[in-house]
Amino acid sequence: MVCFASLRRALPLLLRATTTTTPRFLLPRALSGGVGGGAAVDARALLRGHSGWRGLRVAARMMLDSSDSAAAAGQMQPQQRAAGAVACSAQDGGAAGYASGGWAREDGKLKCGYSSFRGKRATMEDFYDVKLTEIDGQAVSLFGVFDGHGGPRAAEYLKENLFENLLKHPEFLTDTKLAISETYQKTDTDFLESESNAFRDDGSTASTAVLVGGHLYVANVGDSRAVVSKAGKAMALSEDHKPNRSDERKRIENAGGVVIWAGTWRVGGVLAMSRAFGNRLLKPFVVAEPEIQEELVNEDLECLVLASDGLWDVVENEEAVSLAKTEDLPESVARKLTEIAYSRGSADNITCIVVQFHHDKTE
């Protein structure tokens, strides 16, 4: 997602496009040669002083799904379980970098399964979170896939904080869309502040689904995707945030940024997505403002698939939801989709959450 090799080549174009005077950016202390966070520095001098952007190439730590590390990373069981929700299973692949699990509500109306695989990558930068809770007697379910780039920290931060922040929002039950939008952007700000002294520039996507009563809210930042099956047809509830999307390109250019071809279309010739958490060096062009879709949970809504682009790069929307409708256990669906993506040559981490809606049925 991040092309560091092209960053140095593209930066002069970005600088010329954004200002006619000496460019000055707000940079973390680690990148500004000891200048306090919030101080402006000459970006050209910074580039010379740090031998280009080699300093941003921070080796991501290996994150294997052993029983301890998977649990610590939120990669096993939901952290909160509402009354009436029962765990079905949880498996981890140890050194294989594989984890999966699932649960079902006792009334049989909602089932969830998830699978996460390091795949062909040496490091794991995908995270996911599943939470079930109750607020003022209202059952709430939250599902999220976070695909990191430039390191795992941003995705891990979202797993640890995004839903916790959302559940604390005062308007969560009364204006859920507003709560989601504000929480996404606040969490992004909090992450950037927490990393202000860190010598890295991690970023992450977020594809989330929040079920409150009979309403499903799907929010997206980046190129992870959410797809539902509605009345037998696959329907994407999110649109990938790519720099060559006409509306996204216009937004970036209006903010003073540029979209450059460097193997694919990239913001400033660097990032192959137009919205993300983190990526402080590309703010304000790369934002964490989500696009949100609301769906009524009725008999037409059959299933939901959330996944990172490691799946969607090689699996079509229709194929994913078709499998989700034919299998009884959503964990089995998630595992099969992960295996299909890997067998088709997906070179990325692969993470998938499958939610099945069963209307007027009991187990």
From Swiss-Prot:
Reaction it catalyzes: O-phospho-L-seryl-[protein] + H2O = L-seryl-[protein] + phosphate; O-phospho-L-threonyl-[protein] + H2O = L-threonyl-[protein] + phosphate
Transit peptide: 1-59
A GO cellular component annotation in the UniProt record: mitochondrion
Binding site for Mn(2+) 1: 147-148
GO biological process: pollen germination; signal transduction
Keywords on record: Hydrolase, Magnesium, Manganese, Metal-binding, Mitochondrion, Protein phosphatase, Transit peptide
Function description: Probable protein phosphatase that may play a role as a mitochondrial signal transduction mediator in pollen germination. May function in retrograde signaling from the mitochondria to the nucleus. May be a downstream factor of cytoplasmic male sterility (CMS). CMS is caused by genetic incompatibility between nuclei and mitochondria within male reproductive organs.
Family to which this protein belongs: Belongs to the PP2C family.
The protein's name in its UniProt record: Probable protein phosphatase 2C member 13, mitochondrial
Lineage: Eukaryota, Viridiplantae, Streptophyta, Embryophyta, Tracheophyta
